[in-house]
Regions:
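Expand to "…catalyze enediolate/carbanion chemistry for C-C bond making/breaking, isomerization
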Residues: 1-189
Length: 189
């Protein structure tokens, strides 16, 4: 995380950084990792305030602990929150309400921008409704989990050289892009 901040310092504010609490936290050290994220977000190293955080899966007990630690600890300097492993727009709306409630409790008046990872067929089926949510600013395609969710129907090569050429992958990316353009959001992968 420090290397990314250093690179951003050298290159300027030309890219965002996402601190990963889901895959970045060592097992058993999830709270310590979230605390480190807060420390870095509030440090002078966060020059441009273009650092967001990817929290744990909403079904994980660490989702709530991430929110409970990071929003009060560094919410004013947080560029966005990325929510992974969602299944539908109603779930995303409920998670946003939970985030907003914690922000209000923490004295944060701004609405934190939300990035949503589209990683499953369920979320892809509801991608237009997810994109329509006002606080959602970006939909990001989670290629690895999406391919894994097909249990071999998409070959493992779709995670390497051919990652964007398989028809199911192209279809998913197209749906995400169309939903984003329809509602003025940013598509990413």
């Amino acid at each position: 995380m420090r290397k990314a901040l250093q690179l951003q310092k050298e290159l300027g504010p030309c890219f965002d950084i996402t601190f990963d609490c889901e895959d970045g936290a060592p097992v058993g050290q999830e709270l310590a990792h979230a605390q480190l994220v807060c420390e870095l977000l509030t440090s002078p190293e966060n020059l441009y305030q273009q650092v967001g955080v990817r929290v744990h899966d909403p079904l994980s007990p660490f989702f709530d602990s991430d929110i409970d630690c990071i929003i009060p600890g560094a919410g004013q300097r947080l560029a966005y929150i990325t929510i992974p492993k969602v299944s539908h727009a109603i779930q995303v709306s409920q998670l946003i309400q939970k985030i907003n409630h914690k922000a209000t409790q923490s004295g944060i008046s701004k609405r934190l921008p939300i990035h949503v990872l589209i990683e499953t067929n369920e979320s892809l089926a509801d991608v237009f409704a997810i994109a329509a949510l006002p606080q959602v600013v970006c939909l990001s395609f989670g290629l690895m989990d999406f391919v894994s969710g097909y249990y071999g129907a998409i070959p493992s090569s779709a995670m390497h050289v051919d990652q964007f050429s398989h028809p199911l992958t192209r279809r998913a990316m197209t749906e995400i892009a169309v939903a984003c353009h329809t509602f003025g959001k940013t598509p990413a992968h």
